Amino acid sequence: MSKHGVEQLPAARALTWPQRLGQYWKLVRGDRPIGSLLLLWPTWWALWLAADGLPPLWTLLVFTAGVWLTRSAGCVINDYADRWLDPHVERTKSRPLATGAVSGREALWVFVVLMLVAFALVLTLNWLTVALSVPGVFLAASYPYLKRHTHLPQVYLGMAFGWGIPMAFAAVQGRVPLLGWLLYAANILWATAYDTWYAMVDRDDDIRMGSKSTAILFGRFDLIAQGILYALMAATLVLVGLRADLGVAYWAGLAVAALLVAYEFRIARHRERGPCFRAFLHNNWVGLAIFVGIAVAVAGR
């Protein structure tokens, strides 16, 4: 404890370079790719819809690499913001910043390097995409601090995670049509829902530590709220399909996604930590099902 009664974080431990690189890899969640996949699928939805088929190869590479870079940077800044909280939460107490294996200054440098590389890639695209990347950086950097001030950080996460959608339309079409904003809205609803599963895992710890989340806001009505979120997501994706004049494959993909979501409710119905976390992870397959539906639908025109 400090003289002011505030618990001190442990100092960064002396590590060999291989060990330190391993801690950096853990810091950016390289060992847990689920977050990158949840960010990748909606970005690919947008690229395939914007291009009405396979997008230009360089654009596809830039956005795919950008997904990993920005998600990794987001994890770093999230851990930096939560470095005082994570040591007290069961799920996060082994993170590199929480254990002292990586210092706060190191984490900020990792964040800056990742964002600079991502921005360098964006600079190879058109001016509108570059301009849209600026609010994207703000969303990614500010999200971790929302949980201290609002019960809706999951909504903000959806805004941050989905910002690649308008950027993808800008890169391919040079504009962001209504279709792009509909897809963005669907992603906000989806991300709010799947991150609420995640928040349900930490709900007891968050209440104890004074953090806020949709899981706490919804309380005993959490499953009802989840149902509403997923229903609104589905309705928005129906509008996407109608506006883009997508064929049977798309509707089949949505049907598969709906069945996958129903399974999530089945396994998480008792609100236990393990099943809620599995429901969160299961959204990878939801995103994949929708992507396959879009890709096959536009390929078959």
Swiss-Prot record:
PROSITE patterns from the xrefs? UBIA
Q: Tell me the compartments it is located in.
A: Cell inner membrane
Q: What membrane topology is annotated for this entry?
A: Multi-pass membrane protein
Query: Which reaction does this chain catalyze?
Result: all-trans-octaprenyl diphosphate + 4-hydroxybenzoate = 4-hydroxy-3-(all-trans-octaprenyl)benzoate + diphosphate
Q: Which cofactor does it need?
A: Mg(2+)
Note the superkingdom of the native organism: Bacteria
| Biochemical pathway | Cofactor biosynthesis; ubiquinone biosynthesis
E.C. no: 2.5.1.39
Annotated keywords:
Cell inner membrane, Cell membrane, Magnesium, Membrane, Transferase, Transmembrane, Transmembrane helix, Ubiquinone biosynthesis
**Would you tell me the Gene Ontology cellular component terms?**
plasma membrane
Q: Which CDD domains match?
A: PT_UbiA_COQ2
Q: What class of enzyme is it?
A: transferase
- Keyword Transferase (UniProt): yes
The similarity comment for this entry is: Belongs to the UbiA prenyltransferase family.
Task: State the function annotated in the UniProt record.
Answer: Catalyzes the prenylation of para-hydroxybenzoate (PHB) with an all-trans polyprenyl group. Mediates the second step in the final reaction sequence of ubiquinone-8 (UQ-8) biosynthesis, which is the condensation of the polyisoprenoid side chain with PHB, generating the first membrane-bound Q intermediate 3-octaprenyl-4-hydroxybenzoate.
Q: Which NCBIfam families match?
A: ubiA_proteo (TIGR01474)
Q: What is this protein called?
A: 4-hydroxybenzoate octaprenyltransferase
Q: Which organism is it from?
A: Xanthomonas euvesicatoria pv. vesicatoria (strain 85-10)
Q: What is the lineage of its organism?
A: Bacteria, Pseudomonadati, Pseudomonadota, Gammaproteobacteria, Lysobacterales
* Designated gene of the protein: ubiA
